[in-house]
From Swiss-Prot:
Catalytic activity line of the entry: 2 acetyl-CoA = acetoacetyl-CoA + CoA
Active site: C84, H345, C375
Family: Belongs to the thiolase-like superfamily. Thiolase family.
NCBIfam families according to UniProt: AcCoA-C-Actrans
E.C. code: 2.3.1.9
Protein name per UniProt: Probable acetyl-CoA acetyltransferase
Gene name, Swiss-Prot/TrEMBL: fadA4
Keywords: Acyltransferase, Transferase
Species the sequence originates in: Mycobacterium bovis (strain ATCC BAA-935 / AF2122/97)
InterPro entries: Thiolase, Thiolase-like, Thiolase_acyl_enz_int_AS, Thiolase_AS, Thiolase_C, Thiolase_CS, Thiolase_N
Pfam hit, one: Thiolase_N
GO molecular function, one term: acetyl-CoA C-acetyltransferase activity
Length: 389
């Protein structure tokens, strides 16, 4: 069961959260999740946090976050890296451990500071005798560059668009709608149940409170996006506007078995169902969420038309569009409050963010079935079925 969860507002690259490490953001999210669950830190038995960009982050980022959140030194922690799938995999692993009776209470989530990703001087340990030296960007090299085809994942997605035939206007319209829906959701207070403010210290005076995702542009239109240049190929259809934003943030959920929750007198947002995990046949991204959802649906024994809430990570507009088309989804139930194109995509966090958001939607409905799904670098996909608590 997902008892409760919390996330930070998402900051833009070099934005409001630029001075926070991933672990510091993770600690804020963990503490917030425990408070929303009304669960004391002393009950937590294990912590699992996803993080992709760990170079320079120090030993055991998940444990750093756990200890900073007030969880005891006697509680083990695990940092996992499955690229964009890390945050959803953390929840799935927590569920599996609880079902195996290893633990009763697990905190799972994801954290990322893409701003803090350092640059890498490869082979420096063996020294350089002569000539120029190349410095690599950890964010690009270990986060956004496809290792199998040696090109940015956006360029790889552009290649697949040649097959899928999504037009520039289709992608621009989808991206504009993501911003518009996210802006409307903030205005209507939809995110209030999940976002906790972050206090940002100032040189003098009281800290400022960072309270809202800062990448959302309420006045975004498809016409405005049509003026952007292609990002990965001169004749391409993907722009900075139809790709997810580079961002900082963290999210966490409290996962618990039903017996423990009942013993503590707690309610829960959603019950965790089947987990769909897929890969291949190559490293492209577009079909992976749909493939993972199909696998999860099959394991759950339900059909796609039984889904009420669908959250698909908007790595690119083309990924969400492919998922909708391949599954035959009603677009009206997909990312109803916007997605990563608008709010941002801190790599290790996003899987937890969309799972929490789907769980909260189901809780507000009081019934129904949902799914959260993402594509991941290397051509992988994960999906998690949720049922209203």
């Amino acid at each position: 069961m997902i008892v409760a969860g919390a996330r930070t507002p998402i900051g833009k690259l070099m934005g409001s959260l630029k001075d926070f490490s991933a672990s510091e953001l993770g600690a804020i999210a963990i503490k917030g999740a425990l408070e929303k669950a009304n669960v004391p830190a002393s009950l937590v038995e294990y912590v699992i946090m996803g993080q992709v960009l760990t170079a320079g982050a120090g030993q055991m980022p998940a444990r750093q976050a756990a200890v900073a959140a007030g969880i005891g030194w006697d509680v083990p922690a695990l940092t996992i890296n499955k690229m964009c799938l890390s945050g959803i995999d953390a929840i799935a692993l927590a569920d599996q451990l609880i079902r195996a009776r290893e633990f009763d209470v697990v905190v799972a989530g994801g954290q990322e500071s893409m701003t803090k990703a350092p640059h890498l001087l490869m082979n420096s340990r063996s020294g350089y005798k002569y000539g120029d030296v190349t410095v690599l960007d950890h964010m690009a090299y270990d986060g956004l560059h496809d290792v199998f085809t040696d090109q940015p994942m956006g360029a790889l997605t552009e290649q697949r668009n040649d097959v899928d035939m999504f037009t520039r206007s289709e992608q621009d319209e989808y991206a504009a709608a993501s911003h518009q829906k996210a802006a409307a959701a903030w205005k209507d207070g939809v995110f209030a149940d999940e976002v906790i403010p972050v206090n940002i210290p100032q040189r003098t005076g009281d800290p400022l409170q960072f309270t809202e995702d800062e990448g959302i542009r309420a006045n975004t239109t498809a016409a405005a996006l049509a003026g952007l240049k292609p990002a990965f190929r001169g004749d391409g259809t993907i722009t900075a506007g139809s790709a997810s934003q580079i961002s900082d943030g963290a999210a966490a959920v409290v996962v618990m078995n039903q017996e423990k929750a009942q013993e503590l007198g707690l309610t829960w947002l959603a019950e965790i169902g089947a987990h769909g995990v897929v890969a291949g046949p190559d490293s492209t991204l577009q079909s992976q969420p749909a493939n993972a959802i199909n696998k999860a649906l099959d394991r759950e024994g339900i059909s796609v038309d039984q889904l009420d809430v669908v959250e698909i990570n908007e790595a690119f507009a083309a990924v969400a569009l492919a998922s909708i088309r391949e599954l035959g989804l009603n677009p009206q139930i997909v990312n109803v409050n916007g997605g990563a194109i608008a709010v941002g995509h801190p790599l290790g966090m996003s899987g937890t963010r969309i799972t929490l958001h789907a769980a909260l939607q189901l809780a507000r409905r009081g019934s129904g079935v949902g799914v959260a799904a993402l594509c991941g670098a290397g051509g992988q996909g994960d999906a998690l079925i949720l049922r209203a608590g």
